[in-house]
Amino acid sequence: MKLDYARYSERFGALTINSVQHVHELDSGNAEYHRSRTVAQISERELYDMYNRLAVVVPVKNERLKLLEGVISGIPHDCLVIVVSSSSRNPVDRYKLERDTLKHHVLLTDRDVILVHQKDPELAHVFEALNYPYILDGRMVRDGKGEGMLIGLLIAKMMGKEYIGFIDSDNYIPGAVNEYVKIYAAGMLISESPYTMVRIAWRYKPKVAQGGLYFAKWGRISEYTNRYLNMLISSHTGFETDVVKTGNAGEHAMSMRLAELLDYSSSFAIEPYELVYMMEEFGGVLESRHADAMYE
């Protein structure tokens, strides 16, 4: 793979926010490559080594089974797949259908997939035992995408993975999912910090408009989220910026060392809140609880 090194960055205290880094080739071939100062080349060997250290979490709720199967099939074989379901159990047990679909996939591919239901009472008991009641609603884990992602993160940590990625289950193109994971791996490999997050700006999720497909540059909510996050950065630095392009990125990944330091929001606020929290914690706005990480 060939992709840009960061060409433009904003500094927010100890936090570095890079502008979008473009991928020039998903497969850069076997020819010898002389590294330049602006373009990084990642070999297949390096990517496959990273896949073994990466878990990919797929939150799902009542999604079409063909879509879920397509997403799983697009994830590289050596990644650990963790599916966190919040699908309904009646009148049709959607979770059982998901389990049957994944069992068939595992039988055919001989790969590692972990499936868990967000409302499993045993999960709630685990959080009670860990003295983490914030995720509970009564005696069950709350509904919400953020809660599902946190469950997946904890499973990945339990399995000893060094990196964790998230992919939405509503992706229609399995090949795009494969691209996401390659970009996660490449982004981690070229990073110089052990506290790294990679967020994807992928502009090929079309919308149906006036009987055809329309490729919007930004989603409606993303446009607002990006604008206000950039305003927050500008108010701190004193210079206007548009560096944030992925405020609502469901497709993102991070090192486990960073994931262990973050606080998380509930439901669909989780993706933008990750950025807000890092600005607060590592931007010098508030006294940091993780001062050591600010030097790395």
Go through each PLM region and give its residues.
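N-proximal low-complexity "stem/linker" segments adjacent to membrane-targeting elements
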Residues: 1-74
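Short, acidic, metal-binding catalytic loop of nucleotide-sugar glycosyltransferases
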Residues: 46-49, 70-81, 100-108
